[in-house]
UniProtKB/Swiss-Prot annotation:
Record's subunit section: Homodimer.
Pathway named in the protein's UniProt entry: Amino-acid biosynthesis; L-histidine biosynthesis; L-histidine from 5-phospho-alpha-D-ribose 1-diphosphate: step 3/9
EC number of this enzyme: 3.5.4.19
GO molecular function, one term: phosphoribosyl-AMP cyclohydrolase activity
Entry GO CC: cytoplasm
Organism: Ruthia magnifica subsp. Calyptogena magnifica
Protein name: Phosphoribosyl-AMP cyclohydrolase
Subcellular location: Cytoplasm
InterPro entries: PRA-CH, PRib_AMP_CycHydrolase_dom, PRib_AMP_CycHydrolase_sf
Amino acid sequence: MDALKQTKFDDKNLIPAIVQDFKTGDILMFAWMNQESLALTIEKQQAVYYSRSRKKLWFKGEQSGHTQLIKEIFTDCDNDVILLRVDQVGGIACHTGRKSCFFQQLDKNNWKTVANVLKNPKDIYE
């Protein structure tokens, strides 16, 4: 696959992936991908990441049902960052039950929660 050959993975064979809601433009999350997860994402048109903590592929929504259907894939000018524009199934991207993982905003010198939990994580990951 030419796209994989042109993509610049780091010394750990990883590349950062920014995930954006296709309809609203909201940034939903950040994750890591390796060559296998990027190839699977392209093939299946559904987001697959690489979990650094578990050291294995992470099929987004596998447990929660909150899958990410790929609408567009971009890379930056250096081919070392991926942008996935997705349809977020269920409207929840974050394991905390929020739409986005970016729900804390700097307010003076403290982080302030600015987005509500849409669904209790206990109800998502039973």
